[in-house]
Regions:
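Helix-loop-helix hairpins and the membrane-proximal interhelical loops
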Residues: 1-13, 116-118, 147-232
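Generic transmembrane alpha-helix signature in multi-pass membrane proteins
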Residues: 1-3, 46-54, 80, 104-111, ...
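Membrane-embedded helical hairpins/re-entrant loop segments and their flanking transmembrane helices
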Residues: 2-32, 200-271
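Membrane helical hairpin/interfacial module
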Residues: 4, 8-13, 22-81
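Short, non-helical or kinked segments that cap or interrupt transmembrane helices
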Residues: 7-11, 30-44, 84-93, 146-152, ...
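Transmembrane helix-bundle signature of multi-pass membrane transporters/permeases
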Residues: 11-14, 18, 22, 40-41, ...
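Alpha-helical membrane-embedding segments
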Residues: 42-49, 71-76, 101-102, 121-128, ...
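Membrane-embedded alpha-helical modules
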Residues: 52-171, 276-305
Length: 305
């Protein structure tokens, strides 16, 4: 994808993440848990999404995302019949396995991104290493709120270094409009049964991740056990909003574990506070310049994070 398309998709992703978070906070019918959960574009689907888009095109990927989201959302509506099959230890194991499965993707990004002309160059290794070191130092030595932002700190350090090394190009900013609404159906959905089944399988993993995050949030930040209704509603939001995400050319959304840790450490579980962050994401998504700047982040920086 060229930078202009990537910028549009990033804008759409920010808007969808904000909408998903608001739905999770303030439910629509049975969709949404009414818990302080932040939603964002899921890393769980990354490897599969790259494979499907590379083999069949973005249209096939988006078609699978839409159908898979409807399947997960429907499962959430009937969660009381199957939720006990996923005890906390299973959910925790799945979340851990997701992290390990992303290691090859991170390694490729660290070196500059698979297929990049400068893949494995010294510049990429230096930027990636400095970014990683900044993340680790912040995680080890920082305290409280700053420690929870270790990934953001590393990203900023790596981005500034890449800027001074001449690895960032802002030339595309000049032709952008000031405000642009999210673009519906940037890719025409196509439906491939193999791709759909593969994506549905990963949606089940994503549902387990959401259940784990919901349980962890209730136990650590709210000091109580989660209700079956809450976990099912969280999965509904995960699935149905992911289908909407597909309509805007984005991959599925899911709950973000980082917010669970932040809520546990800070004690901030006020839904209005989380909603303000969601609204900021939506506002950021309608300004093309923000989306474009995010596309300029070098792959090595992302890999280091």
């Amino acid at each position: 994808l060229d930078s202009s398309v990537s910028a549009v998709l990033i804008q759409n992703c920010m808007v969808i993440a904000g909408i998903g978070t608001l739905v999770q906070l303030y439910p629509v019918w049975r969709i949404g848990s009414r818990l302080p959960i932040v939603m964002g574009i899921s890393f769980t689907f990354l490897s599969l999404a790259i494979a499907i888009a590379g083999a069949h095109g973005m249209g096939t990927l988006i078609g699978a995302v839409i159908i898979g989201g409807l399947v997960e959302g429907t499962l959430g509506l009937f969660a009381k019949y199957w939720i006990k099959l996923i005890p906390p230890v299973v959910a925790a194991t799945v979340v851990t396995a997701i992290g390990f499965s992303l290691l090859p993707v991170g390694a490729n990004s660290f070196a500059g991104g698979q297929g990049a002309a400068d893949f494995g160059s010294m510049n990429n290794w230096v930027v990636g290493s400095v970014t990683l070191l900044a993340c680790l130092l912040c995680q080890i030595f920082a305290k409280g709120f700053l420690r929870s932002l270790s990934v953001l700190v590393g990203l900023l350090v790596g981005y500034i270094l890449a800027l001074f090394m001449g690895m960032i190009d802002f030339s595309g900013l000049s032709g952008l409009s000031i405000v642009a609404l999210p673009k519906l159906l940037p890719f025409t959905p196509e439906f491939n049964i193999g791709a759909i089944l593969s994506v549905v399988a990963v949606y089940l993993v994503s549902a387990t991740e959401t259940i784990g995050d919901t349980s962890a949030l209730c136990n650590s930040a709210l000091k109580r056990d989660p209700k079956t209704k809450e976990m099912g509603a969280a999965v509904c939001c995960d699935g149905f909003v992911s289908s909407v995400s597909g309509l805007f050319g984005c991959t599925p959304i899911t709950s973000f574990s980082q917010n669970v840790g932040l809520a546990a450490m800070s004690g901030v579980v006020n839904r209005f506070t989380i909603a303000m962050g969601a609204i900021i994401m939506i506002i950021g998504g309608i300004f093309p310049a923000i989306g474009y700047v995010l596309t300029t982040i070098p792959q090595a920086v992302l890999g280091g994070c």
